[in-house]
Amino acid sequence: MLPFDLKAILGEKYDDEFFSYGNKYSEILESEGILIFNSFISNNGLAILQKEANDLKDLSYKSSSEYNVYVSEHDSSFSSDSPRNRIMSTSKKCIPNDLIPENSILQKIYYSKIIRSFFKALLNKNELYPYSDPLSSININYYDKGDALGWHFDNSDFTITLLVKNCKKGGVYEFFNDMRYKDGKEDY
């Protein structure tokens, strides 16, 4: 059963019944490669999350990096302009998990047993464990003018992204299913 504090921040349709049917979404994830849960957070919850993020922003650190879309080492067997070696850039500000208060909505969602059970069923996993890295399990990322998250393939089995504030312009989120591999091999 959803705790009261989560009921107050989740969107209207995300109730106990919704979270009891994680396996219902497995087929959609398998065929589409992505699931989008619109209005997952209520307007009230979103306002609280935005305030939490704004209150922490002064503690954020600036991070910039360059990488190829595979987030792997340069491969000299391919040309520099090959998709395998094309360089992307990311710049952002970040708050690591150790600076996010224990009573934060993000912490409550992350450690919620009912939400974890939902994703276990959805992903057909016997167990999901919280990420033990004290910095990386939950992050708040800020993208100010000129910042960007460069295109890349995720290296994890799955990623959960919670968009707390839309950008004023730009910010196109792109997702392509079944693009990385061809005949069981990475397709450059």
Regions found by a protein language model. Give the residues of each.
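Short amphipathic
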Residues: 35-41
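Fe(II)/2-oxoglutarate
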Residues: 1-31
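A structural signal for short hydrophobic/aromatic patches embedded in well-ordered alpha helices
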Residues: 25, 33, 48-50
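Short glycine-enriched loop/turn motifs at secondary-structure junctions
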Residues: 29-33, 101-102
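Signature of the catalytic double-stranded beta-helix
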Residues: 41-43, 48, 52-55, 60, ...
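Catalytic core of non-heme Fe(II) oxygenases with the double-stranded beta-helix
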Residues: 98-107, 116-188
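Short, solvent-exposed beta-strand-terminating loops
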Residues: 50-51, 55-77, 176
